Amino acid sequence: MRNVKYGKCVRCGKTYDAVPDLTNCTCGGILDIVYDYDYIKSVLTKEKLAKRDNRSMWRYRELLPVEETTPDTPLRVGWSPLYEEPKLAELLGIKKLWVKDDGQNPTASLKDRASAMAVAKAMEAGAKTIACSSTGNAASSLAGNAAAAGIKTYIFVPERAPKGKVAQLMIFGANVISVKGNYEDTFKMSAAAIDKYGWYNRNAAINPYLSEGKKTVALEIAEQLNWEMPDYLAISVGDGCTIAGVWKGFKDLYAIGFIDKLPRLISAQSLGCYPINRAIQEDKPWEPMEENTIADSISVGVPRNADKALMAIRESNGIAVNVSDEEILAAQRLLGRTCGVFGEPAGVTGAAALKKACEEGLIPHDATVVSVVTGNGLKDVANAIKSAGEPIHIEPDLELMVEEFKKRGVTVE
């Protein structure tokens, strides 16, 4: 890969050749992929990019750690819609707001970006099997992307994973192991099995290439905004890989001169599990927390990518905002009713944090903001029903319907 120099440990600085099955440093630190920006600037321009018909994450190949001969993965991942939302911006009291709906990806979450990268690197490594642990989205994402590429998967999920997500990955033909325990127990089980059988490792905090896939959401946002950066970007945080990837994407664009400023990050976590945000708020090393939130995709008490996530938040002069489950469900309704965007609880936690930050005066009124919805609401129907409530139940009689409308104060226009 001419565009890649090496992998570098964010903890001790040791460097490694960027081989397809690259994992953690011997010191236990996470690796970062280091690029040759001078080379990239010589082969990629805004004009060249604008002429490309490829509307997927692979349109940014010069900024991705894949061989030139590696084909695009079969499913079209990326180039999700970015909606300008003036009504919601006015409601929040800010200048401009855009909502990036990554629930429109093939398996309905941002995790498809990481899984597509995992499949590409597994193909480069000649691997026939990929494995990971997941609270749900990474699992279904890997299962779908790997199925399309003809690669077998073994996926470990905690037993609390929503049935809809488990059903999705079962439909994709994954070998699913439901672990009686929390996410940390599940992660350890997957790591032991991967070590025993030699499967390709899709765990985001172990495989440094996955955050490179996730960073494509930032590359898209920048291009969709014609390279004019927002002041803030709000996104939900669990393991830490996504927010780290987003920051890496913006830094890459800044390094090659495509953008002239970097946004501040709004790190959104649930009050039921916020180890990364707590480290920011208390200015201390992160510590494990119990997992107790409806936002299952970010319910990670032992974040394996905390080092990169904390670096991203601090480098961006970011804001850490914790929200309750009730605030998350309220944000789910708000996005649905003002924007027509249906996100799962973890997917709308960024929007919930943005709303709270605006209410607390942390965001100036002249600010421009992008809020990323990381997963589709159909992934967690039970909590969607809890958020939205029940329909009006009546007998097939129009007069009874009119009476029920009166009782409920329903205004007919």
Where do the protein language model's features map onto the residues?
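PLP-dependent amino-acid enzyme catalytic core
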Residues: 1-413
